[in-house]
Amino acid sequence: TNNSDWMPPAIKFLAEHPNDSEYVLWFIRKLERLASYLLVTAQDVNHRVDRYKWLLVEMESRSDSTLADPLRNIELTDWEKEHFRQTLDGEIYTMTAQRRNYIIQRLDSFMSDGGASYNQKLFTIEHVLPQHPPVHGSWLELWPDEQERKYWLNRIANLVPLTRQRNSAAQNYGFATKKEKYFQSKGGTSSYVLTTQVINEPVWTPDVVKKRQAMLSEVFAEKWELNPSRQSGTDEGLFLLAGRGSSAMGYPIDKDCFLVLK
């Protein structure tokens, strides 16, 4: 990301737990998820600082935390998880290049188990269903409903990563030609799992895109653990805010309000 707000808790944690490799790995994964949430949902610097402060306050009061009884404020609340999921399910392509590139690359790395590499200078994101499909051609036959086209156009299911310069002429090719001449490398493959999946689709219809969107949303939910966790009558999913002899437990109900439960 273009900020370093995550560094103070990372440095503090590594200094306090230098010999607990399993707990360090757990913490880094949770911190990456928190940092990703703050980036993807475009939180401003004040909100980011406040959010990390909640974590640092707990770290100060619980320097003896362990993997058996880990830090809690590094977890996303149910409200944050839902906010994260809704953002990821939205119009990714309309975001800033930094945010949309990160989302696509992170998703592709999830699908490839982290084995992919990304050339930032050549990395581009392209639409499968074109932004401006030609009046005469197969695209409007497959996608006759203008509102449906607009709804799915910029969502993640309709986007593929490429490592090549944009080709404005190729963007409006029919699906079969686009796959062969634009999405594939000279060897007939792609270095990205997301693009390979699209290449393997025989047609690109609204039903295909809907199913793909649901599948990709579940990948995010699984890898970033975005399913709800808070249960009525339990402490699951709550924040513990403690410091200077006082503490409170609760959770954010939106980005500005914190509900204190006890």
What is the predicted function of each stretch?
Residues 1-242, 247-255, 260:
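Flexible coil/loop and intrinsically disordered segments
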